Amino acid sequence: MTVSPNTAEQAYLDLCKRIIDEGEHRPDRTGTGTKSLFAPPQLRFDLSNDTFPLLTTKKVFSKGIIHELLWFVAGSTDAKILSEKGVKIWEGNGSREFLDKLGLTHRREGDLGPVYGFQWRHFGAEYKDCDSDYTGQGFDQLQDVIKKLKTNPYDRRIIMSAWNPPDFAKMALPPCHVFCQFYVNFPTSSPDPNNPKQAKTAKPKLSCLLYQRSCDMGLGVPFNIASYALLTKMIAHVVDMDCGEFIHTLGDAHVYLDHIDALKEQFERIPKQFPKLVIKEERKNEIKSIDDFKFEDFEIVGYEPYPPIKMKMSV
């Protein structure tokens, strides 16, 4: 038996297998049915040296991950903006039929309501529609995270949450990836505030811990892992840090019944080394704010996955 050097991806595959073998059979909102475990062991991914945890045992839609994250960061909630870029992952939840089923008959197609991006950038603002300008409204959690990392990196409140119960009735889908916390490790000795001239041997390392309440292991989780790894990378660049780890805490970790055969095919594959994701050299000095990033700024190097495996999204 060949043992993969990529223990992080193997841990993900082993968890999927355990859910299929031991999980409880449960009905679900979509009507598809799942096998589910609650609060399995965390998944951990090393992000140092530009490592990017994009699964290798199937080709993952990296274009979709980058575009969706930039869409969150922009505070956008309009699925049509993503669709126009060839990223159709939100079309089901933004369709006329789906919105009408939720009673959101007044909402135009593609308007998802106050979902992730709105909560990240305008928490507490009153949501009208996806075409309104919310500049200066609500609380900008993402900028608050960045400010704390720059001014008080030891803070234990460096947190961003998409969980806002009063807004649920307006959302096409309440958040699955709910809440993340950032933590800074300082190399060797901690910086001495009384000695500003102290030599810095290396940059501090930024790590991210995500709590995800609902974890679609086959289709969604590979996306979420890469997305939060990329978010950590972007924030680290803006605050002049290196990346440490991404730690993924899962609540209801489930495999949809119609994904089991596809995952069994994936289990036969031996994980390869993760690729690297770099910010293009010519743009590094130009990107000073989290809002400066563009799709073209990122380059994924050394990604040699196995072929794609089709899995249907349950809406």
From Swiss-Prot:
GO terms for cellular component: cytosol; fungal biofilm matrix; mitochondrion. Pathway: Pyrimidine metabolism; dTTP biosynthesis. One of its GO terms (molecular function) is thymidylate synthase activity. The active site is at 176 (nucleophile). Its EC number is 2.1.1.45. DUMP binds at residues 29, 156-157, 213-216, 224, 254-256. (6R)-5,10-methylene-5,6,7,8-tetrahydrofolate binds at residue 216. Keywords: Methyltransferase, Nucleotide biosynthesis, Transferase. It is an enzyme of class 2 (transferase). It catalyses: dUMP + (6R)-5,10-methylene-5,6,7,8-tetrahydrofolate = 7,8-dihydrofolate + dTMP. CDD domains: TS_Pyrimidine_HMase (cd00351). Gene3D superfamilies: Thymidylate synthase/dCMP hydroxymethylase domain. InterPro entries: Thymidate_synth/dCMP_Mease, Thymidate_synth/dCMP_Mease_dom, Thymidate_synth/dCMP_Mease_sf, Thymidylate_synthase, Thymidylate_synthase_AS. It comes from the Eukaryota. GO terms for biological process: dTMP biosynthetic process; dTTP biosynthetic process; methylation. Homodimer. Belongs to the thymidylate synthase family. NCBIfam families: PRK01827.1-3, thym_sym. This is Thymidylate synthase. It comes from Candida albicans (strain SC5314 / ATCC MYA-2876). The gene is TMP1.
